[in-house]
């Protein structure tokens, strides 16, 4: 993803969220963006305060579970635009789908989420990505999702897109026919890069 953007003429900052890659391991848990979005905001603040970027010239890319951190960061900033690929936008839906995929009854979703919050010490439903979709305003967003994604259903991107559209946000949804999870960047690289670069070129100032 970084190379697609840099080859398209964009300065690109790649970050590892807490407990990932080269970043510090501060706990044994992943907080589904509820804490990690602060890492994105830290990078955003650094670009503004140390490098002199304008908020409206900064865009976000979120992939899969990382989309939650991007969405929550967008909600608490003036970031100019956001690109999401195979996004999670409804955590309870993820839990229900995963339970069903594993052969367990979906009514276990609620107690599973409650137990997750108790284990992590963080309310993992405190922020709601679908609520954010109604508050994006005139900023542009672009959602990409493979129609055959077996891990994160297209319903996530479709619901987020529909809420954003109803709130008069300029939202685009690209459903890739037959695509899997984060599959478009590999299966349709040229088209993917063209869409990505065009989107940010037109969306950032």
Task: Report each predicted region and the residues it spans.
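Catalytic histidine neighborhood in serine/cysteine hydrolases
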Residues: 164-182
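Catalytic active-site module of serine/aspartate enzymes centered on a nucleophile-bearing elbow/loop
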Residues: 187-205
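Alpha/beta-hydrolase fold nucleophile elbow
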Residues: 51-63
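Alpha/beta-hydrolase active-site loop
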Residues: 30-51
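Conserved alpha/beta-hydrolase
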Residues: 2-24
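Short alpha-helix in the alpha/beta-hydrolase fold that links the catalytic acid
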Residues: 153-163
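Hydrolase active-site cap/lid region
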Residues: 72-122
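Short beta-strand/loop motif that positions the catalytic acidic residue
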Residues: 136-137, 142-145, 149
